[in-house]
Amino acid sequence: MPRQFPKLNMSDLDEHVRLLAEKVFAKVLREEDSKDVMSLFTVPEDCPIGQKEAKERELQKELAEQKSVETAKRKKSFKMIRSQSLSLQMPTQQDWKGPPTASPAMSPATPLVPGATSKPGPAPYAMPEYQRVTISGDYCAGITVEDYEQAAKSLAKALMIREKYARLAYHRFPRTTAQYLAHQGESVPLEEGLPDFHPPPLPQEDPYCLDDAPPNLGYLVRMHGGVLFVYDNQTMLERQEPHSLPYPDLETYIVDMSHILALITDGPTKTYCHRRLNFLESKFSLHEMLNEMSEFKELKSNPHRDFYNVRKVDTHIHAAACMNQKHLLRFIKHTYQTEPDRTVAEKLGRKITLRQVFDSLHMDPYDLTVDSLDVHAGRQTFHRFDKFNSKYNPVGASELRDLYLKTENYLGGEYFARMVKEVARELEDSKYQYSEPRLSIYGRSPKEWSSLARWFIQHKVYSPNMRWIIQVPRIYDIFRSKKLLPNFGKMLENIFLPLFKATINPQDHRELHLFLKYVTGFDSVDDESKHSDHMFSDKSPSPDLWTSEQNPPYSYYLYYMYANIMVLNNLRRERGLSTFLFRPHCGEAGSITHLVSAFLTADNISHGLLLKKSPVLQYLYYLAQIPIAMSPLSNNSLFLEYSKNPLREFLHKGLHVSLSTDDPMQFHYTKEALMEEYAIAAQVWKLSTCDLCEIARNSVLQSGLSHQEKQKFLGQNYYKEGPEGNDIRKTNVAQIRMAFRYETLCNELSFLSDAMKSEEITALTK
């Protein structure tokens, strides 16, 4: 059966939910006092009066519930369900004996569904012995039964919405979470959660071979409402009958987004999530206290493997700043010494040599220092993104940026390619470090893609230690004001139409087809703190009608990027080609609503600092195990002091975090920027070896490395969740840690499944 996008109407949206969602947007748009806006999403921890009032309300609810006969029955039912769940979550060594036949998602705690057996199956892995922390009788986390039911069902619905969007775009969704959300024991196909990345060429293969492009299909592509539709032929185009692919529906997306917006402001849900997150952090502290030495003993007995020789991926780095400042300075001096009379630019028909470029700037490269180069971010860039962007201009000269850090210039981006290749060689020499640099496509012209592919092939930039991500800066307003684009739809068309053409007719676009093998995802980048006066809704103008010079809001960009990536991925999957992940910058600054948009559309995000401000979203990101690439050193110079960065807190709670460098040229001092990031985090937060190796393992899982590479670096079963998916001989992550993470996630998910099961039992008794 063909995959289709399930549609909803605005009439399906509850009036209360719609009003709450509009209230959130209205508050954010008006830019009211930030504390007032944040109070919508947070729990009043720092306000004694607010805390007291909240406790009073909870106490009144508890007293009212005690007098209710109906509530007493439900409490009894919950206690029974909870005791069953706990009995499944406390495996004994005897329970776990047997051949490794059980499904990974059914261990150690099988979701309770009607008709399911209460006896757990045999262990699919050798269960590690360690001291577990269990709380009995904890059936609703210290809140009323009514609030617990409401919160759990709402969270489950939000996760189902996330799962729908993830599966349609071939993004990842954790199989364990899916199993708990499934009805009547539905199985979740294992391959569903695996994106298709092109495996690296074999040593004897040419990575630039253009002869393996599949045959052309001759399909036609047209844009409707900002989304590209595929048609088998001219007749189908005239009939408006598109090729059988899932095409997104804006009204459905707005309904789903409204549900999440209403959920993150719901009082009982905020309280429930806040308490569960506090519990997760405290539980990890207890786990560390009880099992730290056992974990360390596991690692010490693991031969040949330590933190230095486990694979690490820099999951968020911009290609234009992938070298450190000393590297850039050395390269500038080297080019000036070896080829000063080379023609490097042309201005008004006059050819300009490298010596003349520096003469016009009144400087001698010999006298340059890292200080005079002035590309490093410092105290003056804090909360000043405009000043930070200027740091991309060496010595403040845009001429040097165009010459050394661009792919399109008189030299065809040769200098930039040479520097990137030097960085790649350093990664290859280190053997265990990988990188995912971002290259820019702006959407000014459809020729940008062919130019970038030509740069990649002509300068032979491929490296086995690099995978490429395309970043799309959110700067439509600049292009529109300069009359470079007629509307936002044209920008989307320039970004995505060449990709559809290369997918449909690869024989006609061989260079781009080859380049796309090494591209694994898309990013959306710019200053998130920029304010937008527009509220994205079903009444927003479609991209072809967005002709104003005002920049569309963040959520508008994300929806239309996701929509086109989703259609493209389904078309490429149909052709047996690699697919792409959507990995936007999100939650670094700006509005909490950015994180709502990313929850629906993104496979993973970069930064995620604002999750700290919303317990509901933070808990949802935990339950859905959405990967977050965090860059504490970058944040320290731009938005958040290092000591206040939530990375350590997120790691302890069990969120899927990795460390990344963002911009080594601006933020780092050493040749190995990623190791510098790990070293500082380890020192400041006193992270253990197991913590560091867990973060490194997360980075490989989050990355666009192929299935074959991940099997080689993490183990044959890396895609299975829990200890069964961990090979300590390759990852150096203790099985005790993996078992703790998995059992804790299962416990949290069981709260949601218990609430759904209770509803089914209540319906049956009635």
Swiss-Prot record:
InterPro entries per UniProt: A/AMP_deam_AS (IPR006650), AMPD (IPR006329), Metal_Hydrolase (IPR032466)
Residues bearing PTM Phosphoserine: S85, S107
Tissue: Found in heart, lung brain, spleen, kidney and to a lesser extent in liver.
Region ranges (Disordered): 89-114
Cofactors demanded by this protein: Zn(2+)
UniProt KW keywords: Hydrolase, Metal-binding, Nucleotide metabolism, Phosphoprotein, Zinc
Catalytic activity: AMP + H2O + H(+) = IMP + NH4(+)
GO molecular function, one term: metal ion binding
The enzyme's E.C. designation: 3.5.4.6
Subunit structure: Homotetramer.
NCBIfam families: AMP_deaminase (TIGR01429)
Protein family (similarity comment): Belongs to the metallo-dependent hydrolases superfamily. Adenosine and AMP deaminases family.
Name of the featured protein: AMP deaminase 3
Source organism of this protein record: Mus musculus
